[in-house]
């Protein structure tokens, strides 16, 4: 059997276990001939164990026969940080206005979640990446 040829890749950010075949997904998949409802069904099944509604990136590979496969990534660090400290959004002026504080322990929990998607070789390097994301949002990291 011949290997399928990938013709395009689509990147989306979709709420876990709550995807609906609406405009956002339809507009992204429609031009490639992919069935929106079929993707939504498979995506919701695969993300059922995640926190419902948390936004997760997904990379969809569309093949020449109009079939598809997809990879679900971990939620963005900013969303995990906001959820952990209970804020709606980061600071507009992160260098002067602080919106909250996060402990090193909580940040390490986020690092462990994000580790598969980061290009860091060690947890200490990943910690620096995630703490930088927190600081750029105006969240202070406890020393």
UniProtKB/Swiss-Prot annotation:
Post-translational modification comment from the UniProt entry: One or more lysine residues are methylated.
NAD as UniProt keyword: no
Which Pfam families does the annotation name?
Answer: Ribosomal_L11, Ribosomal_L11_N
Gene Ontology terms: cellular component: cytosolic large ribosomal subunit
Signal peptide, first to last residue: none
Write down the InterPro entries for this protein, in alphabetical order: Ribosomal_uL11, Ribosomal_uL11_bac-typ, Ribosomal_uL11_C, Ribosomal_uL11_C_sf, Ribosomal_uL11_CS, Ribosomal_uL11_N, Ribosomal_uL11_N_sf
Reported function:
Forms part of the ribosomal stalk which helps the ribosome interact with GTP-bound translation factors.
Q: Which family does it belong to?
A: Belongs to the universal ribosomal protein uL11 family.
Query: How would you summarize the oligomeric state and partners of this protein?
Result: Part of the ribosomal stalk of the 50S ribosomal subunit. Interacts with L10 and the large rRNA to form the base of the stalk. L10 forms an elongated spine to which L12 dimers bind in a sequential fashion forming a multimeric L10(L12)X complex.
Q: What is the official name of this protein in its record?
A: Large ribosomal subunit protein uL11
